[in-house]
A protein has these predicted regions:
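Amphipathic, hydrophobic secondary-structure cores in small proteins
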Residues: 21-65
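General marker for long, soluble alpha-helical cores
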Residues: 3-30, 54, 68-70, 81-82
Length: 82
């Protein structure tokens, strides 16, 4: 899927996460998992991280397995006060 072919924000987020995984996967398994989580923690705003966890909660379809593993090390955003 090229970056021009997104059908939804969800597909774009999956695409972006998989691009990050593609970059880090050459570093070996553990370094890749840590690198993916570190990148998402540093550069993704809380709303994007929340969306990541929503997609994973529904099965995580389309994610590189490294992204799914790295999610355990990604900071969960705090719930908004109502």
């Amino acid at each position: 899927m090229s970056h021009e072919e997104y059908k939804s924000a969800e597909e774009k987020l999956v695409y972006m996460a998989n691009q990050i995984a593609g970059f880090f996967q050459v570093m070996g398994h553990e370094a890749a998992v840590d690198g993916i989580a570190d990148h998402i923690n540093k550069f993704w705003e809380p709303r994007m991280r929340s969306h990541l966890f929503e997609i994973i909660g529904r099965g995580g379809e389309g994610f590189n397995p490294l992204v799914l593993e790295a999610a355990a090390k990604v900071k969960r955003p705090k719930e908004a006060s109502v």
